[in-house]
Amino acid sequence: MSKRIFHGILFLINVLAGLFLHSSNPVYNWLTAICLAVVVTYFCKSNFPLFGPALFFLFAYLAALLPFAYLGLFMIVPLALYLVLVLFIRPLKAKSHWLKTGRIGTAIWLWGTIITIVSILALVTWAALFKPNLGDIKSIIPGRGLGTLLPIGVAFAVVNSLVEEAIYRGILWDGLNVVLGRLAVVNLAQAAIFGVAHIQGFPRGAVGVILAFIYGVFLGIIRHRTRGLLAPIIIHMVADLTIFMILMVMLEKL
């Protein structure tokens, strides 16, 4: 087995564990955290470009063990901690290629508009056809009425788009680029992980995973074409605000 393949397998395990492999058993959780820490230490010594991404997914794993993780958006915690380290540790900052806004030309605005419109139509169609059970979401949304909920929706759209783009089209993309190299493979891999991460989101279930995967592919293309995250963040933000408004209508809160 070549060193690159070995590092690719290790990094993939690191990512999947960091995002998905949590248990109600605290012993299992802490043993997993120790294993992830070993992987991070190994990358620090043998493949430094993977050190930063691996470190973030260790932080993500630990954040999921926090008592408030069930509230959602808890990934703000590991992302904020990671950004502080990136800003103050020069070698880590030098390898963080995702911290760029990029350039947005006329063609990108056009494609971004098309992607946004198609995404909104897909969301509305999914909600109308499948009529999902959204009781778990309803229980965490406070109050009712446009005056109360609009600021919450805008804040959610801004924060969630920033966090998810930084993770999937930023940190994860950088790591996958090191171990996979080919743009198409990197894009498909990050979109697949993005899709699986949304299995309990909106849209949800198998169809939700597929829709999120397709959406992730297009956001990845935009990220590559603009060489930065600003355009994907804007597109994602509009989609998230649309999701919030659809949810409010479906939950009869507006």
What are these regions (language model features)?
Residues 8, 54, 108-113, 150-154, ...:
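Hydrophobic alpha-helical transmembrane segments
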Residues 2, 69-77, 148, 152, ...:
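Membrane-interface starts of transmembrane alpha-helices
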Residues 103, 162-189, 224-228:
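Membrane-interface helix/loop boundary segments of multi-pass membrane proteins
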Residues 19-90:
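Alpha-helical transmembrane segments in multi-pass membrane proteins
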Residues 3-15, 21-43, 158-167:
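Hydrophobic, membrane-facing alpha-helical anchors
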Residues 87-160, 178, 253-254:
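Juxtamembrane helix-loop-helix connectors linking adjacent transmembrane helices
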Residues 2-18, 36, 51-61, 113-120, ...:
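Alpha-helical transmembrane segments
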Residues 184-197, 201-254:
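Functionally important transmembrane alpha-helices
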